[in-house]
UniProtKB/Swiss-Prot annotation:
GO terms for cellular component: cytoplasm; cytoskeleton; endomembrane system; membrane. This is Dedicator of cytokinesis protein 2. Belongs to the DOCK family. It is found in: Endomembrane system; Cytoplasm, Cytoskeleton. PROSITE patterns: C2_DOCK, DOCKER, SH3. Involved in cytoskeletal rearrangements required for lymphocyte migration in response of chemokines. Activates RAC1 and RAC2, but not CDC42, by functioning as a guanine nucleotide exchange factor (GEF), which exchanges bound GDP for free GTP. May also participate in IL2 transcriptional activation via the activation of RAC2. It comes from Mus musculus.
Length: 1828
């Protein structure tokens, strides 16, 4: 086989197919997995997954698509970088990261967000393909990058991922190459942009945010329109005039774009097909802010007058007739709100004119208002909004805007008029006319013919342009409206003529009637004319707006003679009335006269950079023509409209500087020119004209040429400054200071031009003048006059703006010195805010970038900063703080960009002067302060720029050691606070990591100082070291460094860029600890928690380095005290909080054990103690990890189990506070599940820690949530009330009564609160009534086995008994159980599995129903207890359970299966009784017994007898019960046709053969016979009841059953003897209700005791019993009150036919319970006592009860069973003990008249006892004997 070889180029690839590895060495791949390839061999690669480097293996080459990479080597480590463009890589990484979140959103059912992320991912995938294609034009690529980065940033924000900071080109900023301040500002900017983007997304107003943001930020815009097609049935040629239209103002706002369309449906010029492109330019922000903008198209037909005329030859052709309009609202496209894509086609519907005389303009308004149907006719266009003017868009969009693209300019100037943009366009709009028909019978069809004529009447060729894209023409023919007296054309054309011709030209308008027939039309001549000159006599142009012209009539030939009409008036006189007279006009010359009937109006708009409409401005521009008016014109300039001035900015400035240059020898006009210049500069500073800054800049650099102007400008400026300094009035000085920047620009440019012209001549003189000028400024700053305050503020604001220019012609160092003096001459506390703002501008200038300048300026700046920052922080100084931090930011930013060699001293200056000041500002500033993040960034930047030598130098600047300690303490506290409460938003990952890197270095540097200065015993500073350790641990445990919690992409990003900083600081902590020496003991146990927190970080190397510190701590304490209890206590306390908080794992537990045990090798004396400690901690960790593992689990059962495990641990280790904490957690879990009984038992454990005393509670035994102090009695009483409420909800009234009695004793005997006692006794009575009247369902019990290694340790291979909820079936329980473990497999057998299943890796669950086993106790033995009471104990307070299954053995008799039916019975013993603090407990013992067929028969017979007896009792108690169940039961036993009863037992067991083969079963056979014999009296009693209740129609059935019974009775009594029950006659009379008894007087226990042999006495006195004695089920309480010693009547209870349940009641030692005078345990003993009592003590403080407590820890707390005290049935000998035990159950008053009958009943029970078999017989309790 060929050897594996290292790959060279094949380094990086992506899986394009799924690869499922079949061998161990194969690497399984999924589509999209990125792999790093290391080696290759044939068709195989070897490598690993990028996202999981531990997943290594081989995989086929054919499954991998290779990617180009570049390999970078850093410190012998190869860094492989994909060769794709960075943005494509970023998209790939983003898609990976979003992909996993996208799946999580699906699982979490967050549909809306899921679909949103999916849509964004699809967008990114598509854009990534476009990026990788490499085919996009430059402008589209740029736009796509913006879209991609915007989408990524937005997606990251809504998915709560880290913010990505970028440069201006969208590339991710590298923190290593970016200063801290730049990084901070980049984060701020990115956050702002994303916040704005989210606002836009939420408002849904701005879907294309990228376009919107660019459009809104640019001053000039253009709209690109591409006409794709025009669909319209015309039949003649047409002209399409497209323009932009403002519907509110009803004005066209752009030039027309003219498309000439042919009659055959194509452009007139076929080469224009697919090339009809236009750009509407010069659109400004004002246009974007219009309410609405429409794209309109006016269609003019060229042809016949009437399109319907058939005879085309006779018709006049070439007429321009209205045809229709097309309109589209493009407001959203213009504003960037709607999609703007050059590929998307828009349809603009066409609307024709409804009549021949409809005006197009009017139709436009109707269409906009109505939006009628177009019938499918219209324009198809594509549009795109472009940013920039025509020059810019030609560069940025060359594929759209080329030489063939038509440019349609705006009607009017753009918002910025650039120099060189020479324009002389005059727009003429034909508005309307009113023409009289005179001699014609109908109104005229008027056509206007416009031309541009010279003063001699000649037509100027090509002077008129109808629309952009069309050739210029000599004359323009208007649209003809048919027979309209007042036509409204509203047609706009452009007149473009050379400027030099403007003075001699005029516009001439001819009016002609056009006839429909060609023959008539030829004879038509011009019937009138108008004219207008474009220039006025004063040299200004025609003013913009409306003009009503004179209409001249006369000879048509004379109309073409300029000399004939130019002498006539052009405008109608304002007062001239159109309808005055029809008489001949007084104005007539040479055959032409003014018509008084006809009217014609136009409007004009002049867009000229050379022609002005202002006389004053014109006078200045042409000052040479009238020099005598120069002073006047200069003064008038200030009142000229600003718009007019800026329009002619270049010409105006040229004029001003020409005046200055031509009067260089005189200063006559210097101040006037200077003031005029200041006025112009002031105009441009105005917000309205701020865009003209670029124009002024361009003028200064390209057009300005006054070489001597600097001298005059400096002279005037100095004069103004000096005048103001003296406090004298100088009106222009404030405007001058505001214009200082441009004044200096002119000065510097002028000096530069002079220097170039004369090769540096007069440089010394210039510098001296400049110096004196600055000295004048400084003098102004020193001035104390009130009038100068405002000037000083202005100087501070505007002086920095001149530096950029001044330093080009002036020595920088000298300039810095002048600036130094400028700031120092201002009094210290004066204008501080303005000084700082001014300094900030200085710092941002080029001057500050020079080292020698910084040397001069930095000290004055730091001094000012220090003074301001150290002022008291209140609202007044808030603004100063803001400016201070901005200034400091600027300084640090400048220094970060310089070479370190040139900034060393400057960093040192800032460090010494400002570091501590900034630190203290951060410390005192609130964390919610708006500026806190800015100051922290500043502080971080200072530390970042400090070198090692800076640190050393700074430490030495402290004069005393206490001052140094204070500084270090301040710094440590500040660092810790900033780490704990990050001042940056959570998604500022890069900023946080840079801060951490800087802090880490600073901490280590300061640690070196501590080692050097504060380690020795005499100089040891405990608090300083303590602060250091706490800071270091806070640093290492901060969330932003826990790499394991991050996504794979983020993990790699941080690791590659910053490394794992936790290791570095962790190793430092270790080293610092070991350097402490004898001082270590000071930090025990204080540092145990922090060190524990550090060791729990899941980084193996860090753990190995830091866990030994624990051993060192133990050793240190051990050597001092002989033990390490403090350490141990602290570890246990802190471990709980840490693990619950998510820290710690199995690996930690193992590592802790192995490392600590290794450490003991060298210290054998402590080895055993350490071993015990490790065992303890390991046990706690296991339980805590189990608990944490199920905290988020849906299964509350598992959480409860783990909580109980922790309860036991804390109880065993005497941790009261933690014990109580988990008690309440368990209580809350139970309440969530409505397990009220279990919640009550849980809370009861807390009460056992409390005494009935007025002692104040210690904090550790306080109830969770109780903050105010309480006494033991108050807390215990409160808890009892809560517990009683829980027991009531859980229907555990027996337990509730027990607690009520204990409370009653306190109320009666201790606090004597009879009111509370009354309420308590009422409550008890209610509970007793509930026991007797309310049905309580018996819960089922289920055995559950968890087998297999897949289960957690607290379940693995264990069996539990679960107590089911009310009416919960096994199937439901099992389904719910399996839902908690979806991967578990259900076992179908009930036998215990083998080791193969137990050791299997999976999960196997076994679940089956078990029967509770009732424990016998003397309390109920041989006593007449009602079913309501005894049934409760059958399924409560049980600890033993069994499960039975039949098995066949021996020979099977098909006729009698009982003979061979054995029972295999599995018995379970739980750790504690149920119910308890859990609904389940672990099985601690299992045993299996086999029950013979004879024993099974005995059990079966016992069950049947019990069932008969129970049913008799029910029917005695409730006469309303239906008779059917009793009928079926009795008939099934007595009828031979049905009966299979004991006959099958006789056949199987009562044979000589059986007796011979089983001599050991004689007693059992006797027992069975005895049970058969006892069945007869029970059946007899049942039949007697049946006889009384049977209906007539069932009487034959009863008779038959009675006959069968007689036969059966005869047979049984003959063979097994006679048994008779006492007869209950006449017992109702005079008996209290509570003493009434039915046949059910013999409980299950007493029945089980009747295992007598045949020698049982056969007769008892008949008068002892009365079958009629049972009372009704629910008699009214008011009628028969309950006596204290009585029981309540029984309720109707149905018995399950499927199973027999036994009950059990366990008692405390009765004799011990009487010892009421014994002392209570101490608090500590009480807590140490076992919470897992096997018996429940109602008064836990008594020694008699406590003596039964097990002090050895068990695995789970027990559920205390009912004690004698709880039941309230003490023996008669207890009557004189505590009041709580003073009441007896069967106490009868001496006056009872029926005492004799009671004795007879007891005599019957005594007889029953005597009949027991010898092995079952037990000693009769004393109290029973006494009673008898």
């Amino acid at each position: 086989m060929a050897p594996w070889r290292k790959t060279d180029k094949e380094r990086h690839g992506v899986a394009i197919y799924n690869f499922q590895g079949s061998e161990a060495q194969h690497l399984t791949l999924q589509i999209g997995d990125v792999v790093r390839i290391q080696e290759t061999c044939g068709d195989w690669y070897r490598g690993y997954l990028i996202k999981h480097k531990l997943s290594q293996g081989i995989f086929p080459t054919s499954f991998i698509h290779l990617k180009e990479v570049t390999v970078e080597k850093r410190r012998n480590i190869e860094n492989i970088i994909p060769a794709e463009i960075p943005l494509a890589q970023e998209v790939t990484t983003t898609l990976w990261e979003w992909g996993s979140i996208w799946k999580q959103l699906y699982v979490a059912s967050k549909k809306e967000r899921f679909l949103q992320v999916q849509s964004m991912m699809y967008d990114l995938m598509e854009w990534r393909s476009q990026l990788l294609s490499g085919t996009l034009p430059k402008d589209e690529l740029k736009e796509l990058k913006q879209k991609v980065t915007s989408k990524i940033d937005y997606g990251n924000k809504i998915l709560e991922l880290d913010l990505i900071v970028r440069d201006e080109d969208g590339n991710i900023l590298d923190p290593d190459k970016t200063s801290v301040i730049s990084l901070f500002h980049a984060h701020e900017e990115a956050t702002y942009k994303i916040t704005e983007r989210i606002k836009e997304e939420m408002s849904k107003d701005q879907p294309d945010y990228g376009v919107y943001s660019r459009i809104s930020s640019s001053p000039t815009h253009s709209l690109y329109v591409f006409v794709r097609n025009f669909v319209c049935r015309i039949g003649e040629d047409a002209e399409l005039f497209m323009s932009l239209y403002d519907p509110h103002k009803q004005t066209v706002i752009s030039e027309n774009y003219l498309v000439r369309w042919g009659s055959k449906g194509f452009p007139k010029e076929i080469e224009m097909l697919n090339n009809l492109k236009v750009v509407f330019t010069d659109l400004g922000n004002k246009d974007l802010n219009r309410d609405k903008i429409f794209l309109i198209c006016q269609i003019v037909r060229i042809g016949k007058m009437d399109l319907k005329d058939i005879n085309a030859k006779k018709c006049t052709q070439g007429l321009r007739r209205p045809f229709g309009v097309a309109v589209m609202d493009i407001t959203d496209i213009i504003k960037g709100k709607a999609e703007s894509d050059e590929e998307k086609q828009h349809f603009i519907p066409f609307h024709p004119v409804s009549a021949e005389n409809d005006f197009l303009h009017s139709l436009l308004g109707k269409v906009i208002a109505s939006k009628g149907d177009s019938g499918g006719q219209g324009l198809w266009v594509t549009m795109k909004m472009l940013v920039g003017d025509i020059i810019q868009i030609r560069k940025d969009y060359p594929h759209l805007v080329d030489r063939t693209t038509v440019v349609a300019r705006k009607l009017g100037f753009p918002e910025i008029i650039m120099p060189g943009d020479v324009r002389n366009d005059i727009y003429i709009t034909l508005l309307q006319g009113d023409f009289d028909k005179y001699t014609k019978t109908t109104q005229r069809n008027v056509e206007v013919i416009m031309c541009v004529c010279t003063e001699d009447g000649k037509v100027l060729p090509n002077a008129i342009c109808v629309g952009a894209g069309d050739k210029a023409m000599n004359e323009y023919h208007s649209v003809v409206y048919y027979q309209v007296k007042q036509p409204r054309w509203m047609e706009t054309v452009k007149v473009a003529v050379p400027i030099e011709d403007m003075q001699r030209i005029h516009l001439r308008f001819m009016f002609r009637h056009r006839s429909s027939l060609e023959s008539k039309d030829k004879g038509e001549k011009n019937f009138a004319m108008s004219y207008v000159k474009l220039m006025k006599e004063d040299g200004t142009t025609l003013h913009d707006g409306y003009h009503e012209l004179v209409v001249l009539k006369g000879d048509s030939k004379k109309m073409e003679d300029a000399s004939a009409y130019l002498t006539l008036p052009s405008y109608r006189h304002p007062v001239e009335n159109k309808g005055a007279t029809l008489s001949r006009s007084s104005s007539s010359v040479g055959g032409l006269s003014v018509s008084s009937r006809d009217v014609f109006s136009i409007s004009t708009l002049v867009c000229s950079t050379k022609l002005t409409q202002n006389v004053g401005l014109l006078g200045l521009l042409k000052w040479r023509m009238k020099p005598q008016l120069l002073q006047e014109n200069l003064e008038k300039l200030k009142i000229v409209d600003g718009e007019e001035v800026v329009k002619f900015l270049q010409d105006t400035l040229d004029a001003l500087f020409n005046i200055m240059m031509e009067h260089s020898q005189s200063n006559e006009y210097d101040i006037l020119v200077f003031d005029a210049l200041i006025y112009i500069i002031g105009l441009i500073a105005d917000r309205k004209f701020q865009h003209f800054n670029t124009v002024l800049e361009a003028y200064i650099q390209q057009h300005f040429s006054a070489t001597l102007a600097y001298k005059k400008l400096m002279t005037v400026l100095k004069t103004y400054l000096d005048t103001s300094s003296r406090g004298e009035q100088c009106e222009p000085i404030l405007r001058t200071l505001k214009a200082l920047e441009y004044v200096f620009k002119f000065i510097v440019r002028s000096r530069t031009l002079f220097s170039q012209l004369y090769e540096g001549k007069e440089q010394m003189e210039f510098e001296e003048s400049m110096r004196r000028l600055f000295e004048s400024i400084n003098n102004l700053m020193k001035s104390q006059y009130k009038t100068t305050i405002l000037l000083q503020v202005a100087a501070l604001k505007y002086i920095p703006s001149v530096l950029h220019d001044v330093e080009t012609v002036f020595d920088a160092k000298l300039l810095s010195q002048l600036l130094y003096e400028f700031y120092t001459c201002i009094p210290p506390v004066k204008l501080q805010k303005q000084k700082v703002q001014s300094m900030n501008e200085i710092v941002q200038s080029n001057l500050f970038k020079k080292q020698e300048c910084r040397d001069i300026l930095l000290p004055v700046i730091t001094k000012e900063l220090k003074e301001l920052l150290e002022q008291r922080d209140d609202g007044q100084h808030q603004a100063e703080k803001k400016h201070c931090v901005e200034l400091l930011n600027s300084i640090l930013e400048v220094l970060s960009c310089q070479d370190a060699a040139f900034t060393y001293d400057h960093i040192q200056e800032i460090m010494v002067q400002l570091l501590r000041t900034v630190n203290r500002t951060v410390i005192t500033m609130g964390r919610d302060h708006a500026l806190i993040s800015h100051f922290v960034a500043c502080m971080t930047a200072i530390l970042d720029q400090m070198g090692d030598q800076h640190y050393s130098f700074y430490i030495e600047t402290f004069q005393t050691s206490s001052d140094l300690v204070d500084f270090l303490m301040e710094t440590f506290i500040m660092f810790k606070d900033l780490i704990g409460k990050n001042v940056y938003p959570g998604d500022w990952m890069a900023m946080s990591m840079v801060q951490n890197r800087v802090f880490l270095r600073a901490i280590n540097k300061f640690a070196e100082t501590m080692n050097q200065k504060f380690l020795e015993h005499t100089s040891f500073e405990f608090q300083l070291w303590n602060n250091y350790f706490h800071l270091a641990v806070a640093f290492i445990t901060q969330d932003s460094l826990q790499l394991e919690q991050f996504t794979h992409a983020k993990y790699n990003k941080i690791l590659n860029k910053y490394g794992d900083m936790r290791r570095l600081i962790g190793f430092s902590i270790r080293d610092m600890w070991y350097k402490l020496g004898q001082n270590k003991i000071c930090f025990i146990p204080g540092m145990v928690g922090p060190i524990l927190e550090m060791t729990l970080i899941p980084e193996a190397e860090l753990r190995k380095a830091t866990i030994p510190i624990f051993f060192d701590m133990m050793l240190c304490e051990y050597q001092r005290t002989g033990a390490f209890k403090k350490f141990e206590n602290e570890i246990i306390l802190k471990l709980d909080h840490e693990v619950e908080g998510g820290r710690g794992d199995e690996q930690y537990m193992q590592l802790l054990e192995s490392i600590l045990m290794e450490c003991t090798a060298e210290h054998p004396t402590i080895a055993k103690s350490v071993e015990n400690f490790v065992s303890l901690v390991k046990g706690l960790l296991e339980k805590l990890l189990d608990y944490r593992g199920v905290m988020t689990d849906e299964s509350k059962d598992n959480r409860m189990s783990c909580t109980v495990n922790l309860l036991n641990f804390y109880k065993d280790n005497n941790r009261e506070e933690m014990y109580i904490r988990y008690l309440y957690k368990l209580r809350d879990l139970h309440l969530d599940c409505e397990n009220y009984t279990e919640a009550a038992y849980t809370l009861l454990l807390h009460t056992w820690l409390l005494k009935w005393s007025d002692e104040q509670c210690a904090s550790q035994v306080m109830q969770t949530g109780q903050q105010h102090p309480q006494t033991h009695r108050q807390l215990k009483e409160t808890l009892y009330e809560t517990i009683i409420g829980y027991f009531d909800k859980g229907k555990m009234w027996e337990e509730a009564i027990s607690l009520c009695k204990e409370l009653a004793e306190q109320y009666e005997m201790e606090i004597f609160d009879y009111e509370l006692l009354s309420q308590n006794l009422t409550q008890q009575a209610k509970f007793y009534e509930n026991i007797m009247k309310i049905l309580r369902t018996k819960p089922d019990y289920f055995a559950v086995g968890y087998y297999g290694q897949g289960f957690p340790s607290f379940l693995r291979n264990k069996v539990f008994i679960y107590r089911g909820k009310e009416y919960e079936r096994r199937e439901d329980f099992q389904m719910q159980l399996l839902s908690q473990f979806p991967n578990a497999e259900k076992m179908n057998t009930t036998s215990a599995p083998g080791d193969d299943v137990r050791n299997a890796p999976g999960q196997y669950i076994q679940c089956f129903t078990v029967q509770p086993v009732l424990d016998e106790h003397p309390r109920f033995k041989n006593k007449p207890v009602p079913d309501q009471i005894i049934n409760f104990y059958k399924s409560n307070y049980v600890q033993k359970f069994h499960y039975s299954r039949p098995v066949r053995r021996g020979k099977v008799d098909p006729e009698n299966e009982f003979a061979s039916m054995w029972i295999e019975r599995t018995s379970f013993l739980t750790a504690y009784k149920l119910p308890g603090i859990l609904r389940w407990f672990e099985v601690v013992h299992m045993s299996q017994t086999t029950i013979s067929p004879l024993e099974n028969a005995i059990e079966t017979m016992s069950t049947v007898n019990e069932k008969i007896l129970m049913m008799i009792n029910q029917y005695q108690s409730d006469e309303s019960l239906p008779i059917n169940p009793l009928s079926m039961l009795l008939n099934g036993i007595v009828d031979p046709a049905v009966m299979g009863g004991f006959a099958k037992y006789e056949k199987a067991f009562f044979t000589e053969e059986y007796s011979r083969e089983h001599p050991e079963d004689q007693d059992k056979l006797s027992h069975l016979k005895d049970l058969i014999a006892w069945q007869i009296p029970f059946l007899g009693a049942g039949i007697k009841i049946h006889e009384k209740r049977v209906s007539d129609n069932l009487r034959p059935f009863h008779d038959r059953m009675e006959e069968c019974f007689k036969n059966l009775k005869m047979k049984v009594e003959k063979e097994y003897g006679v048994r008779e029950m006492p007869d209950f006659e006449d017992r109702r009379v005079g008996r209290p209700r509570s003493m009434l008894r039915s046949y059910r007087q013999m409980s299950v226990i007493s029945l089980a005791s009747m295992h007598s042999d045949c020698s049982t006495p056969s007769k008892v006195p008949a008068e002892s019993f009365d079958l009629e004695s049972a009372p009704p089920k629910t008699p009214k309480v008011e009628e028969e009150p309950i006596s204290p010693g009585s029981t309540l009547p029984e309720v109707k209870l149905r018995r399950s036919k499927k199973r027999t349940k036994r009950s059990s009641v366990v008692f405390a030692d009765e004799k011990a319970a009487t010892e009421s005078d014994l002392k209570r345990l101490s608090r500590k003993q009480e807590f140490m006592s076992d919470t897992n009592l096997s018996e429940h003590a109602a008064i836990p403080a008594r020694v008699s009860i406590l003596s039964q407590m097990s002090f050895a820890s068990q695995s789970m707390p027990t559920i205390p069973a009912l004690t004698l005290s709880v039941a309230g049935v003490p023996g008669l000998d207890e009557a004189n003990t505590s009041p709580r035990l003073s009441q007896t159950f069967f106490q009868v008053s001496d006056g009872d008249k029926k005492t004799l009958k009671k004795k007879k009943v007891n005599q019957f029970f005594k007889t029953m006892l005597a009949s027991k078999s010898s092995e079952e017989s037990k000693q009769i309790p004393d109290f029973l004997s006494t009673n008898m």
